[in-house]
Amino acid sequence: MTNSGTNTDIKKKSKFRLFFKNIFTKDTNEFLLSGNIRYILAFAIPVLIFIVLFIIKGIAPFGNRLYMPSDMYHQYTPFYSELWYKIRNGESLFYTWNNGLGSNFMAVYAYYLSSPTNWTIALFPHDIIPVVLDWLIVFKCAIASLTMTIYLSKHFNTKSSFTTVLAIFYALSGYLAAYKWNVMWLDCIAIAPLI
């Protein structure tokens, strides 16, 4: 029984690799005409929904408000600020002297900041870190929609646009609506469909 389970896993991994190989080797017109536009829509529609919400609520850059509830304001933003300084100044990620008598920054980095997307904050000025965090939420929700579309399409072997609709529901689910301010957990939601 373990051999058949192993063979099935190998076949699934091979299909997954072939899927990505085909996406990146086809020319753009063939990609769009083959029904794969649903992947683009899976990413773009949540972004557009967030943009509309940001406009309605006046959240930066469409207004002067920020989305900073609870721990995102009091805890996460200072962590991201410290990460920004460490990246920009080439400082060590192991220890920080910038809070109290100093502390183990590697533990903070491992739990809160280790997502590769978080390093993008170093591309922006320090004073807009809260705005960048708002847009990281948007990006991670869009990635969650995209990965769920990939999973549903491959698992059910379909090119139906309904997979995109379900994936958008996943990316804009009640859990994400309530807890999207926990930026570090959004990565788990984004990669869960690929596991």
Feature locations, PLM:
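Start-transfer (signal-anchor) and selected internal transmembrane alpha helices
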Residues: 1-59
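Membrane-water interface of alpha-helical transmembrane segments
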Residues: 32-40, 101-104, 130, 134-137, ...
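Hydrophobic alpha-helical transmembrane segments
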Residues: 40-44, 135, 164-168
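Transmembrane-helix signature of polytopic, membrane-embedded enzymes
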Residues: 149-171
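Membrane-interface transmembrane helices that cradle and orient dolichyl/undecaprenyl
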Residues: 195
